Amino acid sequence: MRVIAVANQKGGVAKTTTAVTLAHDLARRGHSVILVDLDAQGNVSPCFGLPPSPGLYRLLLSLVPLEELLVEVRPSLWLLPSDSSTAKLKMILAAEPYRETVLARALALADADYVILDTGPSRDLLHDNAHHAADEVVCPVAVDHLALIGVAQEMETLKFVRDHGHAVEMAAILPTFWDKTTNESQINLEKLVQKFGDLVLPAVPRTTRLREAPALGRTLWEYLDPNHAAYRAYQRLTERILHGK
Ligand SMILES: Nc1ncnc2c1ncn2[C@@H]1O[C@H](COP(=O)(O)OP(=O)(O)O)[C@@H](O)[C@H]1O
Ligand SMILES: [Mg+2]
């Protein structure tokens, strides 16, 4: 089982979009996948046309076993949902011993090829838990002037977690909201490639199609044309995860 966190402390950089899209592609290709929503906004459920619900809260407080909380949202793809109870969860867990490894321990017995963690935008206890549970991180980054800062912060988090004894690696940096009509996109993409080299994947373009899909409870794979540049960019991400190149 490989656990992959989709993380960047900035909000609105396409973390949830990336987690949903990657998880569904791995499932479409025949792997069993658990998608975990770690954000109190509970944005993952609506992407599948479902209301948010307190799955994460119940799991991490050991109220209900994982198998009973998972919702099958597509063939081979199970969702552990979240909602506003996740905010309360952070306060309750703050008093626990070994509090940054609660998620890792809860997922240790999970039966899946991949676990994909969609994280929230703040550096908090659940963010620490995601990094302590993850083997690898995918960092989506909007190619604006804050792009480099977002990735640098994520790299610092990875170093911190490694220094505390948990092996976790950056698997891919995914530039998002690429806009061919602005110099800003190009300049910031070039800066990312200069600094992080092959870790940086081809950029996902800004497209209203990607905004429309979740509103209809559909994923990118069910809504975009396979020739669309965003479709191809997300295919490259899956291939990086599967084959490491
Ligand atoms: N490439 C894109 N082009 C246009 N809109 C996008 C793109 N990727 C994501 N979005 C939209 O941008 C918003 C923020 O994306 P989201 O994945 O929720 O980010 P995060 O989880 O980092 O806050 C959502 O409405 C989403 O549908
Ligand atoms: Mg999100």
Regions found by a protein language model. Give the residues of each.
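P-loop NTP-binding core
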Residues: M1-K245
